[in-house]
From Swiss-Prot:
Database matches in InterPro entries: PTAC12 (IPR034581)
Skewed-composition ranges (Polar residues): 505-516
Record keywords: Chloroplast, Plastid, Transcription, Transcription regulation, Transit peptide
Disulfide topology: none
GO cellular component: chloroplast; nucleus; plastid-encoded plastid RNA polymerase complex
Encoding gene, per UniProt annotation: PTAC12
Cellular compartment(s): Plastid, Chloroplast
Protein name (database record): Protein PLASTID TRANSCRIPTIONALLY ACTIVE 12, chloroplastic
Superkingdom per UniProt: Eukaryota
Subunit structure: Component of the plastid-encoded plastid RNA polymerase (PEP) complex.
Organism: Oryza sativa subsp. japonica
Role according to the record: Required for the activity of the plastid-encoded RNA polymerase (PEP) and full expression of genes transcribed by PEP. Required for the proper build-up and formation of the PEP-complex. Binds single-stranded (ss) DNA and RNA, but not double-stranded (ds) DNA.
Length: 551
């Protein structure tokens, strides 16, 4: 294009004659081959005014359009924070982000769009995979070599030659060598026989976490000592040195244990771990819905009277089955609603609060309604201002009260006494008394009638066995020894009296030494001095009692 003169471009000016004049009919259009964007039609000897007159003007109403009908973009430009400049929102100048910011699948589509056209021409019809050998790599290389190096040479303006050389197909093959296989096999899509679990998983329906067919069968639940997560290195001293070191349960742990007792969940051990309690807490609403559905089914099965009689103490021992309700209806004509109202008339206010809770509109959790008293205390017991029970604890925390700043909490008196066996309940007391009465009735077969009540009195040691006693005292001793000899055989009666006689009045000697004292014979006639009497007696009590007898 540099060979064109400037006068050529001005209107109404003809080009100057060149060295060789070409006649007008032989003048042809010149095209630069291989450079399509440089194509330019050159008119020789024709002015632009004549050419402008030859163009036919087309006036067609269909070409006109209403610019208001074109929907404008929501905004024409935006402030790009990356470049810090105003960028066009649409059009050719709109900035394209880098490949790392493209959405998923865009890179493969762009790569497929940039792929070169297939080299060569197809000689036959496709066989759809029946003859895979027809698409060998060598065949492609032959076709590529036949078409390689093909170029065209055309003459440009002013006698310049421009050569357009096609890119060799070897470079193209090198680019696509990785993605091409040796041959292509067309396969029909296989029909997938999905199981119920795979179908639920693919469709997004609720399904178990593990395929039930491939899941390993879990054995019997192990105790807390056998579970590996409860293993601890055994210390030399007992860890539970105080009964106050027991971990206080929190709400989630108690609820998880209650759900495990009712069979709604399964825990591996005696007490739920923090993980099991957290999993049960995460599915709290689902578990509650399941429990409410089970309660509704039970209500429909057994009837409302039998269902609500659980919270009416007066109706606990009464037959509330459907047959009994129907029989009562046939006898009295009262329908089920009337009988239900009658039953609720026997319900106390406390039972109504337990049954319905604080608000009759809220469906209460059946698990909380039927919790034992100790579980309720574990959750809702304690001080609401400084909670000691109903908060989440550290599982490895061991409270140590042995420091100077701490002391063991003062226990409640009644549970403490009952725990140590110092206090018993009334029922247990009556049971023990009944057992003792039965034992007495079995052992005592015969008791002689004693008219004198003093005959059965117990000797508390007023008289000494080592002194000469009166006849009345001897008779009293014989009478006292008689009930004791009745318990044994008749042959052992004398031995029992002798053994009883060996134990002297000096009980302190028997307590300290464990041996009975042999009685010392001393005459009452011999008068002892004060020092001798003190030395002769074993202790002060014996001395004083002997001194009183001497007087």
């Amino acid at each position: 294009m540099a060979s064109c003169s400037r006068t050529w471009l001005l209107p109404g000016m003809a080009p100057q004659a060149t060295a060789q004049t070409v006649p007008r009919p032989l003048q042809s259009l010149k095209v630069f081959a291989g450079l399509p964007h440089r194509r330019r039609v050159l008119f020789s000897g024709v002015s632009s005014r004549t050419r402008r007159g030859r163009i036919r003007s087309v006036k067609d109403d269909s070409l006109h359009f209403d610019p208001s009908k074109i929907e404008a973009p929501p905004y024409s430009s935006y402030f790009d924070s990356t470049s810090g400049q105003l960028e066009p929102a649409s059009g050719a100048r709109a900035s394209i982000p880098g490949q790392e910011y493209w959405p998923e699948g865009t890179a493969s589509r762009v790569r497929a769009a940039r792929a070169p056209a297939p080299v060569g021409e197809s000689a036959g019809t496709p066989s759809f995979g029946k003859k895979p050998g027809s698409r060998r790599k060598g065949y492609k290389e032959q076709v590529a070599s036949a078409t390689a190096g093909r170029g065209t040479e055309t003459s440009g303006d002013e006698g310049e030659s421009v050569v357009a050389i096609e890119a060799s197909s070897d470079e193209t093959l090198e680019e696509t060598k990785d993605s091409l296989d040796e041959y292509v096999v067309y396969e029909m899509p296989k029909e997938e026989n999905l199981s119920e679990y795979e179908m639920d998983k693919m469709m997004g329906r609720p399904h178990p976490f593990v395929d039930p067919q491939k899941a390993m069968s879990v054995g019997e639940p192990k105790s807390s000592e056998e579970l590996w997560w409860n293993w601890r290195r055994k210390s030399e001293e007992n860890e539970m040195w105080s009964r106050w070191q027991r971990r206080r349960p929190d709400v989630d742990t108690v609820f998880a244990k209650a759900m495990a007792e009712t069979g709604q969940i399964k825990i591996f051990g005696d007490h739920p771990t923090r993980t099991e309690a957290a999993l049960a807490k995460a599915r709290r609403h689902l578990f509650k819905e399941e429990r409410l559905e089970a309660e509704q089914r039970r209500l429909e099965e057994i009837g409302p009277i039998a269902y609500y009689s659980e919270w009416v103490e007066a109706y606990k021992n009464k037959d509330t089955s459907r047959e009994a309700v129907q029989k009562h209806f046939e006898e009295t004509g009262e329908d089920e609603n009337t009988q239900l109202i009658t039953m609720f008339q026997h319900q106390t206010a406390g039972e109504f609060r337990i049954m319905m809770g604080t608000d009759v509109r809220i469906q209460r959790d059946p698990l909380a309604m039927r919790m034992r008293e100790d579980q309720i205390k574990q959750i809702w017991g304690g001080d609401p201002v400084y909670p000691t029970i109903n908060y989440v604890h550290d599982p490895d925390e061991v409270a140590d009260y042995r420091g100077p700043e701490f002391h063991e909490p003062t226990p409640e008196v009644v549970p403490y006494l009952m725990e140590h066996g110092i206090m018993i309940t009334k029922e247990e007391l009556y049971a023990r008394l009944n057992e003792e009465m039965e034992d007495i009735n079995q052992d005592i077969t015969y008791l002689p009638e004693v008219r004198d009540p003093m005959a059965t009195a117990v000797d508390i040691g007023e008289h000494s066995y080592n002194e000469d006693s009166d006849d009345d005292e001897e008779d009293a001793d014989k009478v006292v020894a008689q009930p004791e000899s009745l318990e044994d055989d008749e042959d052992d009666g004398d031995d029992a009296e002798d053994a009883e006689g060996k134990v002297s009045r000096n009980w302190s000697v028997l307590k300290t030494t464990g041996q009975a004292e042999n009685p010392k014979e001393k005459s009452k006639k011999d008068q002892l001095s004060l020092k001798e009497a003190i030395a002769d007696s074993e202790n002060l009590t014996d001395f004083l009692m002997d001194f009183e007898e001497d007087e």
